[in-house]
């Protein structure tokens, strides 16, 4: 099937089939975008009733780090495209699936392997591409970890080589922080337990996500790199709590950001959305991380852009034209669960939606935790500052409560 020139009808022999590996809130939005284009979507996650499961044509629950289980589900469903939405996947199995011609992996199996942990992508960015990064060292024992901190110096940031949403991440400021940071990283890592990255602290003015799309240029039929306007964000313990678009920045810094994003995404190859995280201080820019998929800070694009990052991803992977233009200043603010319970309810929705320019996305996660992201408030405004104030006001109005 020549995807992009021809799309089929779901649940029929002509169907264009896409399998998402990871069906959280970001995957859910990708599924909705794909279904609007008539794509048949299969959602896979490690737990039942995940947000994406609730909107997909079919849902499966497997351990995605189990190569045999992953291969079996692909052989059973026979998707045309496999779209990883999380890091905790048996990427060697994806490479074998792609090599066997069973399905195309988005953006590529190699990109998925490189970005599944911080070591692969940091070595690509710093050592192969020569991009500016913070000083760093890797360690797989407490002794090596202590030596890495001595080499990098304090303060420094410690992260498991494989984790997401800030899990296992901490800042080491004094000797008293060293052992707790190691223990926290060991508890927070996914799959590759026992290995961490120690990063030197960068004194930055702000952080951005440069959403970067590799998609077909309809004028040339070749792959082209497109950029969204920069997304500013606030993170607490490595977890996004607020984002806005556009982030004001100098023309020099913007150009450097896009040069870095272009180099790293071109090296990864394939088609789709990439979230390139960068530190900015004045006109200086440092590469931090890249995800070969929509980014959580990019949830703001549901309000700010004509085509959200999820629609851009869907179009790009299907070989369709994209339009990353900004429509209006907008912001997002996270709604946390607030309590540990299954099947919670939300009060204050009416008040939240009464905020001018506001909208909500309640993700439908089956189980809440106090600091689990259960939804997000979105808001537009005449300025970024106005949008941020509205988004935070709407988020604060939503009150997760026990359904008992």
Swiss-Prot record:
Reading the lineage from the top rank, the first entry is Bacteria
- ATP-grasp domain location is 123-318
> InterPro entries recorded for this chain?
ATP-grasp, ATP-grasp_carboxylate-amine, ATP_grasp_subdomain_1, PreATP-grasp_dom_sf, PurT, PurT/PurK_preATP-grasp, PurT_C, Rudment_hybrid_motif
The record lists ATP as bound by 118, 159, 164-169, 199-202, 207
The catalytic activity, as recorded, is:
N(1)-(5-phospho-beta-D-ribosyl)glycinamide + formate + ATP = N(2)-formyl-N(1)-(5-phospho-beta-D-ribosyl)glycinamide + ADP + phosphate + H(+)
Q: What is its EC number?
A: 6.3.1.21
For this UniProt entry, the molecular function terms from Gene Ontology, in alphabetical order, are:
ATP binding; magnesium ion binding; phosphoribosylglycinamide formyltransferase 2 activity; phosphoribosylglycinamide formyltransferase activity
Which Pfam families does the UniProt entry name for this protein?
ATP-grasp, PurT_C, RS_preATP-grasp-like
Report residues binding N(1)-(5-phospho-beta-D-ribosyl)glycinamide: 25-26, 85, 296, 365, 372-373
Its Gene Ontology cellular component terms are: cytosol
The UniProt entry's GO biological process terms, in alphabetical order, are: 'de novo' IMP biosynthetic process
Binding-site positions, Mg(2+): 277, 289
On subunit structure and binding partners, the annotation says: Homodimer.
**What is known about what this protein does?**
Involved in the de novo purine biosynthesis. Catalyzes the transfer of formate to 5-phospho-ribosyl-glycinamide (GAR), producing 5-phospho-ribosyl-N-formylglycinamide (FGAR). Formate is provided by PurU via hydrolysis of 10-formyl-tetrahydrofolate.
The text of the family note is: Belongs to the PurK/PurT family.
Name the chain's protein.
Formate-dependent phosphoribosylglycinamide formyltransferase
Species in which this protein is naturally found: Burkholderia lata (strain ATCC 17760 / DSM 23089 / LMG 22485 / NCIMB 9086 / R18194 / 383)
């Amino acid at each position: 099937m020549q995807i992009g020139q021809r799309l089929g009808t779901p649940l029929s022999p002509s169907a264009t089939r896409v399998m998402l590996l990871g069906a959280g809130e970001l995957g859910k939005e990708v599924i909705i975008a794909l279904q609007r284009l008539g794509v048949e979507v299969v959602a896979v996650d490690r737990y039942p009733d995940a947000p994406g499961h609730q909107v997909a044509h079919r849902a499966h629950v497997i351990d995605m780090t189990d190569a045999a289980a992953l291969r079996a589900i692909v052989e059973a469903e026979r998707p045309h495209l496999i779209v990883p939405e999380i890091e905790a996947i048996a990427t060697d199995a994806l490479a074998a699936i792609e090599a066997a011609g069973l399905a195309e992996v988005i953006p590529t199996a190699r990109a998925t392997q490189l970005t599944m942990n911080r070591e692969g992508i940091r070595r690509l960015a710093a050592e192969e591409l020569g991009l500016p990064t913070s000083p760093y060292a890797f360690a797989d024992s407490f002794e090596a970890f202590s030596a890495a901190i001595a080499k990098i110096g304090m303060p420094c940031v410690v992260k498991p080589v494989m984790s997401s949403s800030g899990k296992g991440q901490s800042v080491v400021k004094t000797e008293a922080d060293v052992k707790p940071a190691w223990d926290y990283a060991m508890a927070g890592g996914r799959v590759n337990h026992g290995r961490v990255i120690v990063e030197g602290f960068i004194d930055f003015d702000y952080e951005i996500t440069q959403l970067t799309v590799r998609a077909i240029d309809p004028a040339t039929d070749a792959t082209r790199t497109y950029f969204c306007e920069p997304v500013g964000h606030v993170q607490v313990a490595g977890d996004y709590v607020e984002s806005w678009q556009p982030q004001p920045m100098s023309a020099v810094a913007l150009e450097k950001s896009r040069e870095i994003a272009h180099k790293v995404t071109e090296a990864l190859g394939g088609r789709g959305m990439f979230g390139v995280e960068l530190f900015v201080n004045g006109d200086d820019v440092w590469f931090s991380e890249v995800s070969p998929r929509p980014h959580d800070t990019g949830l703001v694009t549901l309000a700010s852009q004509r085509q959200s990052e999820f629609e851009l991803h869907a179009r790009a992977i299907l070989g369709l034209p994209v339009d990353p233009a900004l429509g209006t200043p907008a912001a997002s603010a996270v709604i946390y669960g607030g309590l540990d319970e299954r099947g919670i309810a939300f009060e204050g929705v009416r008040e939240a939606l009464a905020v001018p320019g506001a909208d909500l996305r309640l993700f439908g996660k089956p189980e809440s935790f106090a600091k689990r992201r259960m939804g997000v408030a979105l808001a537009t405004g005449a300025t970024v500052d106005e949008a941020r104030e509205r988004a935070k006001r709407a988020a604060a109005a939503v009150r997760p409560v026990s359904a008992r």
